[in-house]
């Protein structure tokens, strides 16, 4: 029972932090050339698979602040976030749960998902949006992985 309580608490805190960061940085968290600072939390999924659920919940709630709120923001992106987080976790396990690997995988899946969503919503060509999204998502996840590595030198947070 204690393990489930701890995991539930981690998911709630993770999702809440994600939402707060999306809200605080809302001006740069949306649109075609987004830089979602909340993404620094994604690499943490490398250590706890259950955090993929927290990430998906955080995306769903954080997207309430989106100027494009609708089915893509409340259904498609949370599902893609759950899949990206789960895939990132599985690949990172092959590399000793490395934060950088998890972040790179998650960022790749999310940048493709956001690019596709923008092409559906605004008829923006994926070739125009994908390169910038890929770079910005990788940057955010790299910073996050570095932060998690620093935290891990002092604390076992998971």
Question: Where in this protein do the model-derived segments appear?
Answer:
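Hydrophobic transmembrane alpha-helices
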Residues: 1-46, 50-53
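Membrane-embedded alpha-helical hairpins and interfacial helices in multi-pass inner-membrane proteins
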Residues: 27-34, 64-158
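Membrane-helix interface "capping/anchor" motifs
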Residues: 45-56, 92-101
